[in-house]
């Protein structure tokens, strides 16, 4: 569930989910 994932990430990192998603996309699958 995406909503649960967002809550988990925010709880774990304390960072905004949008930033995490952008960072994950940029570093993981988007670019190098």
Swiss-Prot record:
Q: Which cofactor does it need?
A: Ca(2+)
Q: What is this protein called?
A: Basic phospholipase A2
Q: Which GO terms describe its molecular function?
A: calcium ion binding; phospholipase A2 activity; toxin activity
Q: According to the UniProt entry, what is the EC number of this protein?
A: 3.1.1.4
A GO BP annotation: lipid catabolic process
Q: Does this entry carry the keyword GTP-binding?
A: no
Which keywords accompany this UniProt record? Answer: Calcium, Hydrolase, Lipid degradation, Lipid metabolism, Metal-binding, Neurotoxin, Presynaptic neurotoxin, Secreted, Toxin
Positions contributing to Ca(2+) binding: 26, 28, 30
Tissue specificity is: Expressed by the venom gland.
Q: Which chemical reaction does it catalyze? A: a 1,2-diacyl-sn-glycero-3-phosphocholine + H2O = a 1-acyl-sn-glycero-3-phosphocholine + a fatty acid + H(+)
- The lineage's top-level taxon is Eukaryota
State the family named in the UniProt similarity comment for this chain.
Answer: Belongs to the phospholipase A2 family. Group II subfamily.
SUPFAM superfamilies the UniProt entry points to: Phospholipase A2, PLA2
> One Gene Ontology cellular component annotation?
extracellular region
Instruction: Give one Pfam hit by family name.
Output: Phospholip_A2_1
């Amino acid at each position: 569930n995406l909503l649960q994932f967002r809550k988990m990430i925010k709880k774990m990192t304390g960072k905004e989910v949008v930033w995490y998603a952008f960072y994950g996309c940029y570093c993981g699958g988007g670019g190098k």
